[in-house]
A protein has these predicted regions:
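Membrane-embedded segments
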Residues: 86-101, 108-112, 118-128
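Zymogen propeptides
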Residues: 62-63, 67-104
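C-terminal regions of proteins
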Residues: 39-46, 256-267, 273, 278-330
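Hydrophobic h-region of N-terminal signal peptides that target proteins for export
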Residues: 27-35
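A substrate-binding/cap region within the structured catalytic cores of diverse enzymes
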Residues: 110, 122-260
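N- or domain-start disorder-to-order transition segments that initiate the globular core
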Residues: 34-77
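Sec-dependent signal peptide recognition
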Residues: 19-26
């Protein structure tokens, strides 16, 4: 069963679990997939009009600039990264509304999913072509409980259906978990030793991402050891640092999703939207850095979708995102 990762939570990725039990037991709050109790709220039943009732914040000035302003920002972009909290029902409703609006205006656009892995693309294509139904798709991709028990049908399948109804493209963007694990345990050289066909399913960075993204990764990892007040210097990484293998895994996800976007040939008229956990894209995240290296002329817009204003400095340098959508101002 596949589950998700966001800024505060590692969940059931098999890549992570044994390592954390041995090396850093309290790295993040661990939420096992079995801990989800209630059925998730469906994106069509969140009880608000997300186009009207959420705040669309411009981090440059902190103003609520509105839904239409966000669509104008999107219209000038080639690539739109929708950073989510995986268990945020209203956030997924916002994603659905954005996908609908963007594909209505730019019908040749594509929507890529962190939740689907490259070797599952043929199953996605079978669904889009009517060969299999939605239940079969979630079963074959082991996605039924993505984000929460029953999360796929409530949150992600409606977005896929919106793309299908508009004649768009769905992209399985992520690296297969077995190769993410291989990057962690064997290093990137081990990835290069794969036969050509399997090697095409995964990418890794030429150089590990730095800046605030790297700092945040180490800060969250070290938080269980102290108050978090001590500044962490990760300008260089000790080869023996126990977090380095985990960062290789993280960066394998980043690089693979970035290259999946590029392979889809994004442009202003044929946009690629990526649904992905916030951590990968916020504060000049790993995917953003990889896109800049691999496709430097692309116009990339990062939209961070929040339940409430984050405590972290979202207007700093770099800011959390180009646009921040907030469910509640309380």
């Amino acid at each position: 069963m596949k589950c998700g990762f966001d800024i505060a939570t590692f969940t059931c990725h098999a890549v992570y679990m044994n390592y954390w039990k041995r090396a850093i037991p309290l790295f993040f709050v661990v939420v096992g997939c079995s801990s989800f109790q209630k059925s998730p709220v469906h994106v069509l039943e969140v009880g608000i009009d997300v186009r009207r009732d959420v705040a669309v914040i411009d981090p440059e000035n902190g103003n609520d600039s509105g839904w239409e302003w966000m669509l104008e920002r999107i219209s000038g972009a080639d690539i739109v990264l929708l950073g989510e909290l995986h268990d945020h029902a209203v956030g997924h409703a916002i994603q659905l509304a954005l996908v609908e609006d963007v594909l209505d205006q730019f019908p040749k656009s594509a929507v890529a999913f962190e939740m689907l892995e490259r070797d599952e693309q043929h199953r996605v294509d079978d669904y889009m072509d009517g060969v299999i139904d939605a239940i079969k798709l979630s079963s074959l991709t082991q996605s039924t409980n993505w984000g929460a028990r029953g999360g796929w049908a409530a949150w992600y399948q409606p977005i896929i259906d919106a793309v299908k109804d508009r004649g768009g493209v769905v992209v399985a963007a992520n690296a297969p978990r077995r190769y993410v694990k291989l990057a962690r345990t064997g290093g990137f050289d081990r990835i290069d030793s794969l036969p050509k066909e399997r090697r095409s399913l995964v990418d890794y960075p030429a150089e590990l991402s730095g800046g605030r993204y790297r700092e945040r990764f180490w800060e969250f990892a070290a938080h269980h050891e102290d108050s978090g007040e001590e500044e962490i210097d990760v300008t260089t990484i000790d080869p023996d640092d126990p977090l380095l293998p985990m960062y290789r895994s993280q960066q394998t996800w980043d690089a693979t999703m970035a290259q999946s976007i590029i392979n889809t040939k994004p442009s202003t008229e044929r946009k690629v939207l990526l649904l992905v956990g916030q951590f990968h894209v916020e504060y000049d995240g790993g995917i953003v850095q990889e896109l800049r290296k691999r496709m430097p002329r692309a116009s990339v817009l990062v939209i961070s979708i929040q339940r409430e204003f984050p405590e972290e400095d979202w207007q700093g340098t770099p800011p959390s995102a180009d646009v921040m959508v907030v469910e509640t101002l309380n």
